Design a protein with these regions (language model features):
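Short helix/turn-capping signatures at newly exposed starts of structured segments
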Residues: 1-175
Length: 175
């Protein structure tokens, strides 16, 4: 299946809708392979697809327990969650929507870098925060490095304002 041409919808606690087909959480490895084809790469019970932009994690009994998109804002795979484009939506807006659907405890112990929504088993991650970019700009300016129009600064600013990964797991996946 060409993942980049099918609409991809994360359905928390249920699975991944690929066009009109569903890859359910708790699917067997055989079911996953029948839908997606053979994985491009394996690391133990982790299967990777689409040049490592999609990861499937299987438990010890060979059942799908976690689905994660790893491509971020510039990736070819652009999933939706609750009708929002997960990587194109601003980080704060997505957090608000996930919090609303979660209606319960959120693990925000990573201080803005990641959140785990315990009731809906959704996790998001980014490697850089807006305040990190501001600190980088201040440091560059102190060292006489131009920041206005600097492509590295602009790239980091875009990355800080969006999520780099989003994943869904079986109920209770996040403790």
């Amino acid at each position: 299946m060409d993942l980049s041409s099918a609409p991809l919808e994360l359905l928390p606690l249920k699975g991944l809708r690929l066009g009109d087909q569903l890859l359910p959480l708790s699917a067997s490895k055989e079911q996953a392979e029948a839908l997606l084809g053979p994985a491009e790469e394996f690391q133990g019970d982790q299967w990777y697809y689409a040049e490592s932009e999609l990861r499937l994690d299987f438990d010890q009994s060979g059942r799908l327990e976690f689905i994660e998109f790893l491509g971020g804002l510039e990736g070819r795979l652009q999933p939706t969650v609750y009708a929002l484009p997960a990587f194109q939506t601003g980080a704060d807006e997505l957090i608000e929507e996930l919090t609303r659907h979660n209606d319960g405890p959120v693990d925000d112990s990573e201080q803005g870098y990641s959140y785990a929504f315990l009731n809906i088993s959704v996790g998001v991650y980014r490697s850089i925060l807006p305040q990190d970019v501001q600190e980088l700009i201040a440091e560059m300016e102190e060292n006489g490095i131009p920041t206005r129009g600097n492509p590295d600064v602009e790239r980091d600013r875009r990355r800080a304002e969006h999520w780099e990964t989003i994943g869904i797991g079986l109920p209770g996946y996040y403790p």
